[in-house]
Swiss-Prot record:
Keywords: Acyltransferase, Cytoplasm, Transferase. One of its GO terms (molecular function) is protein-N-terminal amino-acid acetyltransferase activity. This is N-alpha-acetyltransferase MAK3. InterPro entries: Acyl_CoA_acyltransferase, GNAT_dom, NAA30-like. It comes from Arabidopsis thaliana (Mouse-ear cress). Expressed in roots, leaves, flowers and siliques.
Length: 190
C-alpha cells in the first residue's frame, strides 16, 4: 500500500488538460503510451487508421505538458446498428484512480452520441479488474466472453453500452385517423 502511494503523482484535478487529437505531433505521444501499457502490439498503420479517420474520437490528457492518458476510438455501421468502438484506453500508472480514464471515456462517448451512435463496444482482458470496474461504473455490461482473444492467450469480455432510443412522438396513421373520423359523433343538422 505504501509503495502504491509513493507511485501516485500529486496533482489537482484542475491541472489535467484534455484535448482532441490535433495532428501528427500527437501521434508519437499516443503510440508511446499504448505501447508501454497495453498487451497488444499495434503498427503505425493501425494508429493512423484511427486518428486520421476519427480524429474527433481521439482524446489526450496532459499534466503540466506531459501526456498521461489517451483514448482512441472509431465508429461505423455494424449489422443494423451505428456503433462506436473504444479501441485503446491508457492512463499511466502514477495517474490512475484519479478520474482521468473516466473523463476520457465520457468525452469519447459524448462525441459518439452526438454523431448518432446507438451503442459503444470494446474488449477488455478478463483479468483487468481496473478496466472492468471503470466500464461497469460507466454503465457498460458484459455482453460476451471471447476465449483466447488476445495474442498473449488471455480471454476478453466484450463490453457494451447501449444508448436510450430517442423518443419519437407517435403520429397516428391515415387509417387510424379515418377510423376516428368515422366513429366521431357528428352534430345533427336539422
Amino acid at each position: 500500500m505504501e509503495k502504491e502511494m509513493e507511485d501516485k503523482e500529486e496533482f489537482d484535478e484542475g491541472e489535467i488538460e484534455y484535448t482532441s487529437y490535433a495532428g501528427e505531433h500527437h501521434l508519437p505521444l499516443i503510440m508511446s503510451l499504448v505501447d508501454q501499457e497495453l498487451s497488444e502490439p499495434y503498427s503505425i498503420f493501425t494508429y493512423r487508421y484511427f486518428v486520421y479517420l476519427w480524429p474527433q474520437l481521439c482524446f489526450l490528457a496532459f499534466h503540466k505538458g506531459k501526456c498521461v492518458g489517451t483514448i482512441v476510438c472509431k465508429m461505423g455501421d455494424h449489422r443494423q446498428t451505428f456503433r462506436g468502438y473504444i479501441a485503446m484506453l491508457v492512463v499511466i500508472k502514477p495517474y490512475r484512480g484519479r478520474g482521468i480514464a473516466s473523463e476520457l471515456v465520457t468525452r469519447a462517448i459524448k462525441a459518439m452520441m452526438e454523431s448518432g451512435c446507438e451503442e459503444v463496444t470494446l474488449e477488455a482482458e478478463v483479468s483487468n479488474k481496473g478496466a472492468l470496474a471503470l466500464y461497469g461504473r460507466l454503465g457498460f455490461i458484459r455482453a460476451k466472453r471471447l476465449y483466447h482473444y488476445y495474442l498473449n492467450g488471455m480471454d476478453a469480455f466484450r463490453l457494451k453500452l447501449l444508448f436510450p432510443k430517442p423518443r419519437v412522438p407517435q403520429i397516428p396513421s391515415q387509417v387510424q385517423t379515418q377510423q376516428e373520423y368515422e366513429t366521431f359523433p357528428r352534430p345533427r343538422v336539422p
